[in-house]
Curated annotation (Swiss-Prot):
UniProt-listed Enzyme Commission number(s): 2.5.1.19
A GO BP entry: chorismate biosynthetic process
Gene from which this protein is expressed: aroA
Protein residues bound to phosphoenolpyruvate: 25, 96, 124, 173, 356, 400, 425
Role summary: Catalyzes the transfer of the enolpyruvyl moiety of phosphoenolpyruvate (PEP) to the 5-hydroxyl of shikimate-3-phosphate (S3P) to produce enolpyruvyl shikimate-3-phosphate and inorganic phosphate.
Protein name: 3-phosphoshikimate 1-carboxyvinyltransferase
Active site feature: 325 (proton acceptor)
Species this chain originates from: Bordetella parapertussis (strain 12822 / ATCC BAA-587 / NCTC 13253)
């Protein structure tokens, strides 16, 4: 798939089968950093093999962490109290789950570092995190536009003077980065560290993932709802010995959607009713749209209508603040709804791998949908009968755009996905697995 300029999707009618999900990106990169900061050795299984995890692994090795060879999703990491290499230039691609947490960890440890990424990474805001780290006395310099990467870290005087405040309305990754790095400073300073959230915290389920994983590495965070989080002065990460990564719930959304529009059943394994990921709630969205959703320990299964034969999903008007990544799948499913669909509270889309509101608006219109959008919302009216149009779908160097629009193959238009290799960010084999679930139109 890598290197292909485009992929013409075969017209699809039915979808059925079972998919073993790749490891969660959000969990994988968090666990890699926590294992590096923890005392002892951690064997990680089920690790996602993707661009973003390779970026994190390469950065940890460059910082002097002992990282074993990755084989079949397994890797062993020897933790360090602080990174042995105190001067380095790190290239972190477009991996926000690597860039933000590493920025915080490096700033609070001390040293001299330069962090950069691809051009889009340099358009993704980081100013709120930098402002919070500067409250600890961290020396951080913008090497380009203020508020954005690339960054130079070093030269500060780290201290704890009281609670640190961080804006919560732009990205939950800023709070995640501070939480994960705070035990390093709490232990060294001998002081409790309190992080206070300013504004309305978005994407709260991702903070739940962070807190859950920190606890598995021995650090329990005291909290006052979503307003304040305190890390005790004696907090210390300890490797759990062995850590299994659960499947990616955001990736599950595409396959569960296939079951909802292709009849099904489609079952995903690796996530289930006991998942720590908020995006499993997307299954409830599918149920609200009329799909039959079933859960078990470590699996979710969907059955639904056959949209290629005239079946329709129920239209929706919903707040997707808690599941912004899976919400993109809902936007493409709106092509098959029985009326206009509205996605609200998705402002975080603007600062993801691309401006996802603009990108989704543009590509859905190509297929004949009626689309309106605003700062934090998107409304999609399905194409009228006879109104579908053949389309070359731009993916905007965004893995989720490519995977979402694979669902368009169930409509009556010819669909070409441009740059399908962008799925390598999280799921290099996506289109092969997708094809295995489809039955071509008669």
């Amino acid at each position: 798939m890598s290197g292909l300029a485009y992929l013409d999707l075969p017209a699809a009618r039915l979808a059925r089968g079972e998919v073993a999900l790749p490891g969660s990106k959000s969990i994988s990169n968090r666990v890699l950093l926590l294992a590096a900061l923890a005392e002892g050795s951690t064997e990680i299984t089920g690790l996602l093999d993707s661009d973003d995890t390779r970026v994190m692994l390469a950065a940890l090795r460059q910082l002097g962490v002992s990282v074993g060879e990755v084989a079949d999703g397994c890797v062993t990491i020897e933790g360090v109290a602080r990174f042995p290499i105190e001067q380095a230039e790190l290239f972190l691609g477009n991996a926000g789950t690597a860039f933000r947490p590493l920025t915080a960890a490096l700033a609070l440890m001390g040293g001299d570092y330069r962090l950069s990424g691809v051009p889009r990474m340099h358009e993704r805001p980081i100013g709120d995190l930098v402002d919070a780290l500067r409250q600890f006395g961290a020396g951080i310099e913008y090497l380009g536009q203020a508020g954005y990467p690339p960054l130079r870290i070093g030269g500060g005087s780290i201290r704890v003077d009281g609670p640190v405040r961080v804006e919560g309305s732009v990205s939950s990754q800023f709070l995640t980065a501070l939480l994960m790095a705070a035990p390093v400073l709490a232990r060294r300073s001998g002081q409790d560290i309190t992080i206070e959230v300013v504004g309305e915290l978005i994407s709260k389920p991702y903070i739940e993932i962070t807190l859950n994983l920190m606890a598995r590495f021995g650090v329990s965070v005291r909290r006052d709802g979503w307003r304040a989080f305190t890390i005790a002065r004696d907090a210390a990460y300890r490797g759990p010995g062995r850590m299994a990564i659960e499947g990616d719930a955001s990736t599950a959304s595409y396959f569960l959607a296939l079951g909802a529009i292709g009849g099904g059943p489609v079952r995903v394994t690796g996530v289930g009713e006991d998942s720590i990921q908020g995006d499993v709630a997307f299954a409830a969205t599918l149920a609200a749209m009329g799909a039959d959703v079933r859960y078990g320990p470590g699996w979710i299964e969907t059955r639904g209508v056959r949209v290629a034969e005239g079946g329709r999903l129920k239209a929706f008007d919903a707040d997707f603040n808690l599941i912004p990544d899976a919400a993109m799948t809902a936007a493409t499913l709106a092509l098959y709804a029985d009326g206009p669909c509205r996605l609200r509270n998705i402002g975080s889309w603007r600062v993801k791998e691309t401006d996802r509101i603009h990108a989704m608006h543009t590509e859905l219109e190509k297929l004949g949908a009626g689309v309106q959008s605003g700062a934090d919302w998107l409304e999609v009216a399905p194409p009228a009968p006879g109104g579908w149009r053949d389309a070359h779908i731009g993916t905007w160097d965004d893995h989720r755009m490519a995977m979402c629009f694979s669902l368009a193959a169930f409509g009556p238009a010819a669909v070409r996905i441009l740059d399908p290799g962008c799925v390598s960010k999280t799921f290099p084999d996506y289109f092969d697995v997708y094809a295995g679930l489809l039955a071509a139109r008669d």
